[in-house]
A protein has these predicted regions:
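A structural signal for small-residue-enriched, beta-sheet-centric alpha/beta enzyme cores
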Residues: 2-83, 88-97, 107-412
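Generic structural marker for isolated residues within well-ordered, non-membrane alpha-helices
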Residues: 103
Length: 412
């Protein structure tokens, strides 16, 4: 266990997951590699679901039906089925039928209502789910449900990802252990405002739907909506947060919000760092903004700039690209007030070029390109607008030739 701050600590998710939640992850033959490709989360009775989904107008079947079911049940859902390999997007009525067949069978096996089952899919767009393989393996999936199968479920949702993306934390409130655990997938087609990513969060502190929705929205805005790999948005983006358990007093909500933020930001940074072909994480902090929305918007603009990303990959301290991306963000600021840092080197002071050693900045970026994963492989950029008290952070990665290779060979 490692300490995060005064409230939350990381825990081993193979031993500690939110009370009452069960997880499963198996191979159903949906991927040619025979890797795990089918996951299931079963929540306790009375659980509360909140979901946020892709903002693309081209949406997968699962996105629309999941939103409908969350609304119809007022968030009282019990299970999430997740498949990887086929996105079930742009598949017409067949996609709807496959969704209904799969969720109907899971509901039957679990003894719950079909409307209490959600389904999320990820994979190749336009390819229908291999429904026969999926359905025949659902009994095995249900049999695999265990509290400590969290990692299997996390593994089963991956596609081009190179690493597992999972985190579990706990704290004690009034003598009671509270746990929050989440896992995600995402490596390419990642752009601020939810993009080709799936993420799931579970929490064993009971919170009513209205408050839970607010907490999830706040966390997503500061995490999954603040990352960029390549500026592409997907058809299947989904984030679902679930809570269940004994009700928590409202005065402790800020602690729960802090925990949700920690999990979501941890997963978001993992997604950004695992960008296809990436060698480092790019972290942009904007300070001195008039409000948080402006700060995040400006930070995202820098993270999403292909010119900034390629400069970082080339270890080129091309600060002009950074300030240009800031200027294109839509956020109003006075250049004459701006301070800019790359690492510890101050590049601009009050909008004017400061004396700095470009080679030291190049060496700083090079060292981060060779650093340990999410430890010292983070290139930090800080922009201070000096016009307010608010701040915001966004994350991205370098853009490499490897990204082009991966996506020129991957069937879309």
């Amino acid at each position: 266990m490692s300490q995060l701050d005064s409230n939350w600590s990381f825990v081993d998710d193979s031993k500690v997951t939110p009370k009452g939640f069960l997880f499963a992850g198996i191979s159903a033959g949906l991927k040619a590699s025979n890797k795990k490709d089918l996951a299931l989360i079963l929540a306790p009775e009375g659980s509360v679901f909140s979901g946020m989904f892709t903002q693309s107008i081209v949406r997968a079947t699962c996105v629309d039906i999941c939103q409908e079911r969350i609304k119809k049940t007022s968030g009282f859902v019990r299970a999430i089925l997740i498949n990887s390999g086929q996105a079930n997007a742009c598949t017409g009525n067949l996609g709807i039928q496959h969704f209904q067949i799969a969720t109907g069978k899971i509901a039957e096996l679990l003894g719950i209502k079909e409307e209490e089952v959600l389904m999320c899919s990820t994979g190749v767009i336009g390819v229908p789910i291999q429904i026969n393989d999926l359905v025949k393996n659902l009994p095995n999936l249900v049999s695999d449900l265990k509290g400590n199968n969290f990692e299997n479920a996390a593994e089963a949702i991956l596609t081009t990802d190179l690493t597992l993306k999972k985190v579990s934390i706990e704290t004690i409130i009034q003598g009671r252990k509270i746990k929050i655990a989440g896992f995600a997938k995402g490596s390419g087609m990642i752009y601020p405002n939810m993009a080709t990513m799936l993420a799931f969060l579970t929490c064993d502190a009971g919170i009513q739907k209205e408050e839970w929705d607010k907490m999830i929205a706040i966390a997503v805005q500061k995490s999954f909506n603040a990352i960029s790999v390549d500026g592409e948005t997907s058809t299947n983006d989904s984030f679902v947060g679930i809570n269940a358990g004994e009700k928590i007093e409202k005065r402790f909500f800020p602690i729960i919000q802090q925990g949700i933020d920690i999990v979501c930001q941890n997963l978001a940074k993992n997604i950004a760092r695992d960008g296809e072909g990436a060698n480092c994480l790019l972290e942009v902090l904007v300070q001195g903004a008039k409000n948080t929305d402006d700060a995040i918007m400006l930070a995202k603009s820098i993270c999403n700039s292909a010119l900034v990303k390629t400069a970082i990959h080339g270890c080129d301290p091309n600060w002009g690209r950074i300030i240009s991306a800031a200027g294109n963000s839509g956020v109003k600021f006075n250049l004459n007030d701006v301070d800019l840092y790359i690492g510890n080197a101050q590049i601009l002071e009050n909008g004017k070029l400061n004396k700095y050693d470009p080679q030291k900045v190049t060496d700083y970026i090079k060292s981060r390109m060779k650093g340990r994963y999410l430890v010292d492989d983070i290139v930090k950029i800080m922009l201070n607008l000096n016009s307010g008290e608010s701040k915001g952070t966004a994350w991205g990665c370098d853009l490499s030739k490897k990204y082009v290779e991966i996506n020129s060979e991957y069937t879309t």
